[in-house]
Amino acid sequence: MLQPKRTKYRKPHRVSYEGKAKGVKEINFGEFGLMALDGAWIDNHQIEAARIAMTRYMKRDGKIWMRIFPHMAMTKKPAEVRMGSGKGNPEKWVAVVKKGTIMFEVAQVNEQVAREALRLAMHKLPIRCKFVKRGEN
């Protein structure tokens, strides 16, 4: 699964996913992309499931770029544990996705195949998304 090799801090503060994206707002590598219409924390399993769905539909033709990576550890305390006594242990790795972020890019396939592959990926993600073309957004 996707996770960083090393982190400076084991238990980071929870970064907000409210507001608009600052960095990854345009398609830079491929011809078509998947843009987030909401903000959310997307975990490594969801990113991997979306990638596998696209790869299988395209039958390994074309090229896929993942523009998000789960850098942040989410912590959770065990069930039925009283409050206090420190922060919980790292449970999963998440990517902070804000509104307008391009999450995946696809190239070297026609638009119909790209649209269907990205539609399948949308169903694996917990947020609303839309299909965009290069230069359109």
Swiss-Prot record:
Pfam families, alphabetized: Ribosomal_L16 (PF00252)
Gene3D superfamilies membership: Ribosomal protein L10e/L16
Alphabetized GO MF terms: rRNA binding; structural constituent of ribosome; tRNA binding
UniProt-listed GO biological process terms: translation
Family: Belongs to the universal ribosomal protein uL16 family.
Quaternary structure note: Part of the 50S ribosomal subunit.
Annotated HAMAP family: Ribosomal_uL16 (MF_01342)
Name listed for the protein in its UniProt record: Large ribosomal subunit protein uL16
Lineage, highest ranks first: Bacteria, Bacillati, Mycoplasmatota, Mollicutes, Mycoplasmataceae
